[in-house]
């Protein structure tokens, strides 16, 4: 969650609390029920930090597909490469042109890295599937940019604990089907970019699809997120 003033970010992925340059954030992560039952590692990854312009904060999150070989490694490869692009950015005013340029650079870098990973490990590139959620905010202007491929969600929570969904999960013919960074048509059908401005004293939640399963997280979420439908 990201909160204006002392911006607060809850990237649901690790169970720790931090204070990072005008922004407080919590990270929580836990393997899902199916994963625990079958001895599968947690396949989510997250990176948070500030760009060269320290007024800009980012949260990058990825979920490796369960059927994907080396799913955890693929998720970390996804967020690590996204972070390399975001860290060097310095945007005083977030706009559509910058957003499209950054999103394209990130996706191309992720795909190139996954392709090299596939060659090195004798794997099929088409099976190295991962989602991507990026929330990037200028802490002074409160302007934000969201880059989203696949499921997961981003929501803005105000002082009264009501939610405005900023980015919904994207699913296909069934709720279990989603889109990934390595899809052939990722730029035309899968990549979504949104812009806006966060209100004062509000928070932002960034989460993978696991947010619906983890009851210890789910029970504290505003009901609007609980009722969110896959689209």
Predicted regions and their residues:
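PP2C/PPM-type serine/threonine phosphatase catalytic domain
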Residues: 2-231
């Amino acid at each position: 969650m990201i909160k204006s003033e002392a911006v607060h970010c809850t990237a649901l992925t690790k169970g720790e609390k931090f204070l990072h340059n005008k922004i407080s954030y919590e990270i929580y992560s836990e393997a899902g029920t199916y994963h625990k039952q079958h001895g599968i590692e947690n396949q989510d990854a997250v990176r948070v930090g500030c760009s060269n312009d320290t007024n800009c904060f980012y949260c990058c999150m990825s979920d490796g597909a369960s059927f994907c070989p080396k799913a955890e490694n693929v998720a970390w490869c996804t967020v690590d490469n996204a972070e390399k692009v975001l860290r060097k950015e310095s945007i005083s005013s977030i706009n559509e042109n910058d957003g499209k340029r950054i999103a394209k650079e990130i996706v191309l870098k992720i795909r190139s890295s996954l392709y090299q990973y596939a060659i090195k490990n004798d794997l099929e590139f088409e099976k190295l599937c991962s989602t991507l959620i990026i929330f990037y905010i200028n802490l002074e202007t409160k302007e934000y940019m969201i880059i989203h491929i696949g499921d997961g969600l981003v929501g803005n929570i105000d002082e009264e604990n009501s939610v405005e969904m900023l980015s919904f999960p994207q699913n296909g013919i069934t709720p279990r089907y989603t889109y990934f960074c390595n899809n052939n048509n990722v730029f035309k059908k899968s990549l979504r970019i949104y812009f806006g401005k966060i209100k004062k004293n509000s928070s932002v939640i960034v989460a993978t699809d696991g947010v619906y399963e983890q009851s210890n997280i789910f029970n504290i979420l505003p009901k609007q997120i609980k009722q969110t439908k896959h689209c």
